A protein has these predicted regions:
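Short, low-complexity N-terminal intrinsically disordered segments enriched in polar/charged residues
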Residues: 11-39
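Low-complexity, intrinsically disordered terminal/linker segments enriched in charged
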Residues: 15, 89-90, 102-106, 114-144
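Hydrophobic pocket/interface hotspot
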Residues: 31, 43, 111
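Surface-exposed, charged secondary-structure patches
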Residues: 14, 19, 52-108
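Bacterial N-terminal signal peptides
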Residues: 1-7
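Short, well-ordered alpha-helical segments enriched in acidic and aromatic residues
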Residues: 38-53
């Protein structure tokens, strides 16, 4: 019985989410807009590990420069790029973006619902690992 209970999180069902209250879509767009404007602190504040997220964003900005940083995230707002799926496992979400301007490459963002609000999911978890596998599956299907 204990083994079954320990394995239960691994058996969590993935489900597709439509736009609405169960979706992390609005939070994702807010984060992307902050990043496209170079507003690292505001974007990092929408994470479940804000200090670490800020450090990662700052390091990336410092490595590519301010303008390239803004372009990198601003591209998600470009009309050729679109959100093609939102997959949930428990409170966690994977948003899958098709980047048309990058040859249809797929990019993923991870969010988690905390106290009724979605934030960037920067804390490792079993469900997040499973969502990474889902993203790999989407990418493999896209190639075939």
């Amino acid at each position: 019985m204990a083994l079954l209970l320990a394995a239960a999180p691994a058996l969590a069902q993935e489900r597709l989410i439509e736009p609405g209250p169960e979706s992390a879509r609005e939070t994702a767009l807010t984060v992307i807009k902050h990043l496209a404007a170079g507003e690292l602190e505001q974007a990092a504040g929408l994470s479940n590990a804000p200090k670490r997220r800020f450090e990662v964003l700052r390091d990336y900005r410092d490595s590519v420069g301010e303008e390239q940083f803004k372009r990198s995230f601003g591209r998600f707002l470009s009309p050729e790029n679109r959100l093609i799926a939102e997959v949930a496992i428990g409170p966690r979400r994977l948003l899958v973006w098709e980047l048309g301007e990058a040859g249809g490459e797929l990019a993923g963002q991870f969010y988690v619902e905390v106290d009724g609000k979605f934030v960037l999911d920067d804390v490792p978890s079993r469900e997040r690992d499973e969502l990474r596998r889902v993203l790999r599956r989407y990418r493999a299907e896209k190639k075939s």
